[in-house]
């Protein structure tokens, strides 16, 4: 018997078996407008499951706008046309439960944004909002999430301390732990290491490489070295268009588009 408490979005997502599909998320004929200004005019991409895909390009090229469209973070400020396909659903359609969809497509922002709560509560708070109140369950998920974000050994004895007392790199990894606590399929990251020092950046990269065993990861970065180190695929954006998308090794050693080569080699602009 169907669970009548489930939304249509929940039922459709649960009915789709991702094991039968290599593509976790795709966009078709995607266009994004801020008023009359078109920020994305050619945004057709497919993201393979359990891979890291990097979105690169100059400032203002549209890569962050594109990323934020993937879980409809732009809904209030932009008009998005075209299809965003996830588990057989066009999640850009009006009948999608956006709140439920975001449980499956998580987001980590450029600057760490921990809650003004304890380390433990930063993760447990969202779980309680979803009806999970049993302490044993909360404890297990908090520990699992912190372990996956490579933080558990650093904070296991300080879970009741304020998250605001953590270093910038630790705060960002806590935000990653918070995002994965509800076990999304896909993790979106908008320049997650741009405000961090090299050591913290390396720790974030190592964390993402571990996480891709269980998550599909899409990351915006201005750091070419970072893209080449951690991503399996790279898309080059310019002026709101995806000019090239291929395996990262191919993009960095044998780009097919002159502008891609210019950007990677530092001769762009």
Curated annotation (Swiss-Prot):
Keywords: ATP-binding, Cell membrane, Membrane, Nucleotide-binding, Phosphate transport, Translocase, Transport. The keyword Cell inner membrane does not apply. Residues 25-264 form the ABC transporter domain. Its EC number is 7.3.2.1. GO terms for cellular component: plasma membrane. Its main location: membrane. The keyword 4Fe-4S does not apply. It is found in: Cell membrane. Belongs to the ABC transporter superfamily. Phosphate importer (TC 3.A.1.7) family. The complex is composed of two ATP-binding proteins (PstB), two transmembrane proteins (PstC and PstA) and a solute-binding protein (PstS). This is Phosphate import ATP-binding protein PstB 1. The gene is pstB1.
């Amino acid at each position: 018997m169907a669970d009548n408490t489930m939304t249509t979005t929940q039922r459709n997502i649960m009915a789709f078996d991702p094991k039968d599909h290599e593509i976790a998320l795709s966009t078709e004929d995607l266009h994004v407008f801020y008023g009359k200004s078109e920020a994305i005019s050619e945004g057709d991409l497919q993201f393979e499951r359990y891979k890291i895909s990097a979105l690169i390009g100059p400032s203002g090229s549209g890569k962050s706008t594109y990323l934020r469209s993937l879980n409809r973070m732009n809904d209030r400020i932009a008009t998005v046309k075209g299809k965003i396909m996830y588990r057989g659903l066009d999640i850009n359609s009006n009948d999608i439960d956006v709140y439920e969809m975001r449980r499956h497509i998580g987001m980590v922002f450029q600057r760490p944004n921990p809650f003004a709560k304890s380390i433990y509560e930063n993760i447990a708070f969202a779980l309680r909002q979803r009806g999970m109140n049993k302490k044993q369950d909360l404890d297990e998920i908090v520990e699992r999430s912190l372990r996956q974000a490579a933080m558990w050994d650093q904070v296991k004895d300080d879970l009741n301390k304020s998250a605001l007392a953590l270093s910038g790199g630790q705060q960002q990894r806590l935000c990653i732990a918070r995002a994965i606590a509800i076990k999304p399929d896909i993790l979106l990251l908008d320049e997650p290491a741009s405000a961090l020092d090299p050591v913290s950046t390396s720790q974030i990269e190592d964390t993402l490489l571990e996480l891709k065993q269980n998550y599909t990861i899409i990351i915006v970065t201005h750091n070419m070295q970072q893209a080449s180190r951690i991503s399996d695929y790279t898309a080059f954006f310019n002026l709101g268009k995806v000019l090239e998308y291929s395996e990262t090794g191919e993009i960095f050693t044998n780009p097919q588009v002159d502008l891609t080569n210019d950007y990677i080699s530092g001769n762009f602009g």
